[in-house]
Amino acid sequence: VKHIRPTVEKCLETSLNEIELFEVKCFLLRCHEMLPLFQQVQSALQWEGIGLEDTVQALDLLDPERNRVASFFISDNSSPLLRSLRREKRELEEQIRRLPAGEEREEVQARRVRVASEEELEEMRIRKELSAALRPHVPALLYNTEMIGEIALTVEKARLARRYGG
């Protein structure tokens, strides 16, 4: 599991970019997959203080369709404006492909640049909203990074002990 503590801490102060949101989503997916295993181990071994926080609500923010795949993109369903801008951009791109070189094509290309700029602004607004919505989940995310790190360290110590007869 990739160490994402700096990204999670950054979320407390500012908006995350698309790559950082992807990293957080991947971490949340791993936590979601590991949670039942941690619960089984905790129950079987009666370990206190070892476990993961359930972060499914945070995962649902970044995966509203609940596809549970390691990818991230801001979908058209994120806002009606975004859907409209993307549709308009696709239509303009199709016009550009059909138009011969010349003044009319340049005008359509200029409109496409303006629409793409508006699309980027809307995506930025959505990333800002997603980052703000993740903030209440930051303590659970940080806790889970610590727990996963502790378990990984314990497993490595056990491997070394086995290897060297300890």
Predicted features, each with a name:
Residues V1, R5-L35, L62-G166:
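Alpha-helical coupling/stalk and coiled-coil linker elements that connect catalytic or binding modules
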Residues Q39-E53, Q57:
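Long amphipathic alpha-helical segments that form oligomerization/scaffold cores
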